[in-house]
């Protein structure tokens, strides 16, 4: 007879490309290592652990004993190693070739380093797109986990989410596990007893139910106050002890065991989705606030509760709409990926250089710098700089991949580089890459120093965020953007003084026309009145090129006899 409840517990540990060594070290000390040591003391607790590629490489260099411990616990079948895309990209932003390559390369790394078989994967930010199923299956993935939000958006009821399902794409199938939002909030922010009560309610509803927890390992030691809660005060110890005491009716299972031993509930085709909070963060501030109000109101109204699961926000892809800087990084990565694929197909490039360029491209696709939610994300300059550094490195390696193919002259390429339906201009030589956007104020939006692997214009505009209302409200009034039932915590006083918004891009060659007596403070905080729309208007561009010289001329049409022009040589 099957157990009353099978409990699958999945932990996702990640630090992004470009994060500081001290952050890696502190996270290992406060969360990753204490959890493994706690598991050693509770052999009855079986979990699946995903360690992202950037973190695994750092651990192998700084704490190889941690990976050795993972390998031993995997060999003892107390834990299952979960694969993924190597450098933790959101797969929705990758072409299929890069999705498959990232997954296969990381599976090979994990199986070689940890000497274990990898059958499942963690999807970064649990961002799902229906077109992924075939790519994941082609990469050898047998199962993954997604939020119950995805399943509810497909029309499944709560009582259908106590089992795993299949999904399908292009004739290939994949097992998918629904992660309980209730358990995500209870562990570790409720009490251990609440988690057990939830499992008990599943057992009462249907014998043989499956419960799935899956969330960030940083919740157990890195997030504010969680090291004290989870380890010093013994929250996790209490949970594990309660689970071991409940072994007569709760069976801790590894995901691959469930896939092998338990028939799926059926096949479901899931819509594009992520976890609930992510679908809200991607919306503009006003829409975000409206979406949250609608969801909370519907959940609280018995007449509307049935439709509440269908109230969700937007597509993860639209972070590229919210933040043009994210789209600039994405477009840069796509340009590298396209060039790399073309050189592979030509067959005359150095395979070692292509391999190194692939690694650099994959590192430049690490997701954290491409969006913003509860944590810094795209607002962190060291993450943006790291992405550009890797993408510039990849381009440089591709330059060297063909014999005698180093860039010696200067060239201009005109095309729609950023997918906005308008042309941009890329001017390149050995030391520099310059990218112009005539239709967006004639700005220079990227300037790469190739030898330094650095984009001087990896800047970020100041723009409205939904939580700015909480910042302006101040301590004692503001609510947490993660859980509105909790007060917001302020790291410093006077943050409201820094809430400013830019009326134009923070780039180069932006033409501003202010009155002579303009207040410099008004210029700095973005409130100075401008005469004309030269900073944001559409310029006409002409490129004049010779063997040793490229001139880009921007003309701004006016009603007067002469146009406003700017020229870059």
Residue locations for each model-derived region?
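Catalytic domains of cell-wall/extracellular-matrix polysaccharide-remodeling enzymes
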Residues: 104-159, 219-239
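CE4/NodB-like, metal-dependent polysaccharide N-deacetylase domain
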Residues: 98-125, 172, 200-215
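Positively charged, amphipathic and often flexible ligand-engagement surfaces
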Residues: 86-90, 149-156, 160, 176-190, ...
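Generic structural signal for well-ordered alpha-helices
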Residues: 32-39, 67-71, 100-110, 133, ...
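Active-site and substrate-binding clefts of carbohydrate-active enzymes
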Residues: 2-33, 40-42, 160-174, 178-182, ...
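Short, well-structured secondary-structure segments
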Residues: 5-95, 101-102, 119-123, 142-148, ...
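Acidic-aromatic substrate-binding/catalytic surfaces of carbohydrate-active enzymes
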Residues: 25-29, 97, 101-104, 430-544
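Short, small-residue-biased leader/transition segments that mark boundaries at the very start
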Residues: 556-561
């Amino acid at each position: 007879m099957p157990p009353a409840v099978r409990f699958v517990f999945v932990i996702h540990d990640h630090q992004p490309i470009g994060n500081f060594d001290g952050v890696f070290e502190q996270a290992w000390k406060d969360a990753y290592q204490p959890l493994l040591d706690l598991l050693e003391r509770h052999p009855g607790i079986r979990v699946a652990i995903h360690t992202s590629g950037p973190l695994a490489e750092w651990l192998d260099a700084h704490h190889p004993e941690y990976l050795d411990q993972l390998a031993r616990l995997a060999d003892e079948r107390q834990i299952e190693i979960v694969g993924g895309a190597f450098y933790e990209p959101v797969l929705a932003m990758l072409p299929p070739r890069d999705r498959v390559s990232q997954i296969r390369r990381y599976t090979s790394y994990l199986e070689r380093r940890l000497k274990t078989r990898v059958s499942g994967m963690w999807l970064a930010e649990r961002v799902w797109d229906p077109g992924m199923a075939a790519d994941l299956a082609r990469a050898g993935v047998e199962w993954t986990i997604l939020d119950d939000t995805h399943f509810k958006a497909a029309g499944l009821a709560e009582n259908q989410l106590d089992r795993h399902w299949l999904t399908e794409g292009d004739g290939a199938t994949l097992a998918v596990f629904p992660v309980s939002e209730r358990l995500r909030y209870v562990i570790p922010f409720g009490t251990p007893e609440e988690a057990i009560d939830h499992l008990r309610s599943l057992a009462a509803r249907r014998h043989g139910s499956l419960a799935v927890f899956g969330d960030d390992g940083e919740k157990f030691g890195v997030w504010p106050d969680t090291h004290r809660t989870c380890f010093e005060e013994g929250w996790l110890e209490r949970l594990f002890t309660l689970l071991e005491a409940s072994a007569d009716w709760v069976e801790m299972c590894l995901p691959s065991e469930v896939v092998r031993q338990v028939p799926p509930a059926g096949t479901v085709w899931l819509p594009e989705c992520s976890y609930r909070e992510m679908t809200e963060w991607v919306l503009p501030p006003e829409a975000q606030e409206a979406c949250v109000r609608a969801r909370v109101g519907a959940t609280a109204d018995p007449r509307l509760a049935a439709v509440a699961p269908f109230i969700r926000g937007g597509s993860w892809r639209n972070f590229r709409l919210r933040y043009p800087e994210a789209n600039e990084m994405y477009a840069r990565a796509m340009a590298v990926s396209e060039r790399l694929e073309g050189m592979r197909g030509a067959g005359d490039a150095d395979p070692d250089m292509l391999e190194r360029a692939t690694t650099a491209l994959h590192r430049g696709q690490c997701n954290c710098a491409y969006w913003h939610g509860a944590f810094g994300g795209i607002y962190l300059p060291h993450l943006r700089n790291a992405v550009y550094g890797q993408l510039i490195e990849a381009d440089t390696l591709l330059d060297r991949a063909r014999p005698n193919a180093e860039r010696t002259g200067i060239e201009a390429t005109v095309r729609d580089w950023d997918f906005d339906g308008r042309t941009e201009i890329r001017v390149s030589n050995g030391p520099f890459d310059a990218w112009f956007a005539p239709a967006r104020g004639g700005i220079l939006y990227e300037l790469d120093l190739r030898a330094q692997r650095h984009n001087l214009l990896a800047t970020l505009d100041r723009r409205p965020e939904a939580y700015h209302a909480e910042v302006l409200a101040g301590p004692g009034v503001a609510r947490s953007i993660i859980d509105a039932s909790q007060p917001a915590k302020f790291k410093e006083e006077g943050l409201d003084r820094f809430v400013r918004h830019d009326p134009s891009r923070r780039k180069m060659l932006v033409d501003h026309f202010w009155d002579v007596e303009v207040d410099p403070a008004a210029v700095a905080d973005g409130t100075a009145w401008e005469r004309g729309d030269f900073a944001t208007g559409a310029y006409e561009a002409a490129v004049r090129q010779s063997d040793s010289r490229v001139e880009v001329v921007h003309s701004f049409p006016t009603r007067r006899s002469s146009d406003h022009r700017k020229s870059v040589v």
